[in-house]
A protein has these predicted regions:
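Short, well-structured N-terminal submotif of metal-dependent ribonuclease cores
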Residues: 1-34, 46-58
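Acidic, PIN/NYN-like endoribonuclease modules and their adjacent C-terminal/linker elements
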Residues: 2, 99, 103-135
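Short loop->beta-strand "edge-of-pocket" segments that line small-molecule binding or catalytic clefts
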Residues: 5, 31-34, 63-68, 108
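Anionic group-transfer/hydrolysis microenvironments
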Residues: 10, 43, 113-115
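A generic structural signal for short hydrophobic patches within well-formed alpha-helices
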Residues: 12-13, 39, 116-117
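Active-site-proximal, substrate-binding regions of enzyme catalytic domains
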Residues: 37-72, 76
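Short, hinge-like loop/turn segments at secondary-structure boundaries
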Residues: 49-53, 86-87, 126-130
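Active-site neighborhoods of divalent-metal-dependent phosphate/nucleic-acid chemistry enzymes
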Residues: 68-114
Length: 135
């Protein structure tokens, strides 16, 4: 079954750190996936906060979340176009990877970043961006 949701780093961190919004993410986790780039952001954030890398990785594996590793030329072009046209939102590469993955698969991008709501319904290269805020 194709994932209905694509999580960004903030959404996954809400589960791991028991932050506000974690209930919503927990409720859709079995229908969600994340890109490896965003997973790397989560591991980095956990390690920076003092969690040993091995523990961070083990904690994330326990969630059994589908991890997407592919990112082709077409997706890179979409991602770059998004980064270039919405610089005003301060989107990182990881943000744009998540948004690209969601738009290309017809899924909803899930985030805690309120700035993303401005992207709801944006069409880039014939793909529509859909956003859900967890808080």
């Amino acid at each position: 079954m194709r994932a209905q949701y694509v999580l960004d780093a903030s959404a996954l961190l809400s589960i791991v750190l028991d932050e506000r919004g974690h209930q919503r993410v927990g409720g859709i986790l079995d229908r969600s996936r994340i890109h490896a780039v965003n997973l790397a952001e989560v591991v980095g954030r956990l390690v920076r906060s003092g969690m040993p890398a091995e523990r961070a990785v083990a904690t994330l594996h326990e969630l059994h979340l589908e991890v997407e590793e592919e990112f082709g030329a077409g997706q890179a072009e979409f991602c770059g176009a998004l980064m270039g046209t919405r610089r005003d939102l301060g989107l990182s590469l990881g943000d744009c990877v998540c948004l690209t993955m969601a738009a290309w698969s017809g899924a909803v991008a899930v985030t805690a970043d309120r700035r993303w709501k401005e992207l709801e319904g944006t069409v880039v290269n014939d793909e529509t961006i859909r956003i859900e805020l967890i808080r």
